[in-house]
Amino acid sequence: MKQYLDLVKYVLNNGTQKGDRTGTGTKSVFGYQMRFNLAEGFPMVTTKKLHLKSIIHELLWFLKGETNIAYLQQNGVKIWDDWADENGELGPVYGHQWRNWNNEEIDQITELIETLKINPNSRRMLVSAWNPSVLPDTTKSFAENVANAKVALPPCHAFFQFYVSEGKLSCQLYQRSADIFLGVPFNIASYALFTMMIAQVCDLQAGEFIHTFGDAHIYNNHFEQVALQLSREPKPLPKMILNPAVKNIFDFKFEDFKLEGYESHAHIKGAVAV
């Protein structure tokens, strides 16, 4: 997938060395944008194999508004394990903010879809996971922050906006912090899929997914992995098929998604910076 590989090359060639919260160190740039026309195929990185099951279940978990990793673990998804407390709690993370903003019963997803159906020309179709009132105390552990009703980890993909033109729905995501090797391929696929889901339930066609970054970085312990990806020839994009019978965003189940024609190079392991 050219857009992703271009991002990797740009950061390697233009990034500056920076320290970070985890102590790992990064090569980083500030401000970058990728665009994906969803009519050209589903944007799944092919220079390494991605775990689609984790991507789908995480998105469904967000839409449920849940803050406990039990659902993820029941479905074999471990991507949030490192940040949860002993009871599996993460604090009021993404899904909670999407569905019950600041515990004020503001369902941003429901309001978004209602606006898309009633006033698709609105410039107010935004959803935010960034809530300053629940950001963690950096001097405390993940579990201590959760116990204090804070998030274990601040949202990396902070907010997104939808736009309708000529019957096509596009989504722009602002990601304040982006782990290019491990996180970004997941984020691309997740928000592309989310855009397709929203488009279907609003009787629209999927348009573009635009991915805008703040701090986009490659961790120092991922340089070998991204070099390996750059040495591999990208394969054609697959096609994502959604169950056309689903008309409510909250009715989607794992079985309603089918990825056709996904061919990729082998998986590449990389340590998560916690």
UniProtKB/Swiss-Prot annotation:
Catalytic residue positions: C156 (nucleophile)
Assigned keywords, A-Z: Cytoplasm, Methyltransferase, Nucleotide biosynthesis, Transferase
Reaction equation(s) it catalyzes: dUMP + (6R)-5,10-methylene-5,6,7,8-tetrahydrofolate = 7,8-dihydrofolate + dTMP
EC number of the protein: 2.1.1.45
Transmembrane segment boundaries: none
SUPFAM superfamilies cross-referenced by the UniProt entry: Thymidylate synthase/dCMP hydroxymethylase (SSF55831)
Gene Ontology molecular functions: thymidylate synthase activity
Binding site for dUMP: R21, R123, R124, R176, S177, A178, D179, N187, H217, I218, Y219
EC primary class: transferase
InterPro entries associated with the record: Thymidate_synth/dCMP_Mease (IPR045097), Thymidate_synth/dCMP_Mease_dom (IPR023451), Thymidate_synth/dCMP_Mease_sf (IPR036926), Thymidylate_synthase (IPR000398)
Residues in the signal sequence: none
Subcellular location as annotated: Cytoplasm
Residues binding (6R)-5,10-methylene-5,6,7,8-tetrahydrofolate, per UniProt: H51, D179, A273
Pfam families: Thymidylat_synt
Main location: cytoplasm
Biological processes per GO annotation: dTMP biosynthetic process; dTTP biosynthetic process; methylation
Record-linked Gene3D superfamilies: Thymidylate synthase/dCMP hydroxymethylase domain
Pathway: Pyrimidine metabolism; dTTP biosynthesis
Subunit-level organization: Homodimer.
Function: Catalyzes the reductive methylation of 2'-deoxyuridine-5'-monophosphate (dUMP) to 2'-deoxythymidine-5'-monophosphate (dTMP) while utilizing 5,10-methylenetetrahydrofolate (mTHF) as the methyl donor and reductant in the reaction, yielding dihydrofolate (DHF) as a by-product. This enzymatic reaction provides an intracellular de novo source of dTMP, an essential precursor for DNA biosynthesis.
Similarity field: Belongs to the thymidylate synthase family. Bacterial-type ThyA subfamily.
Record's protein name: Thymidylate synthase
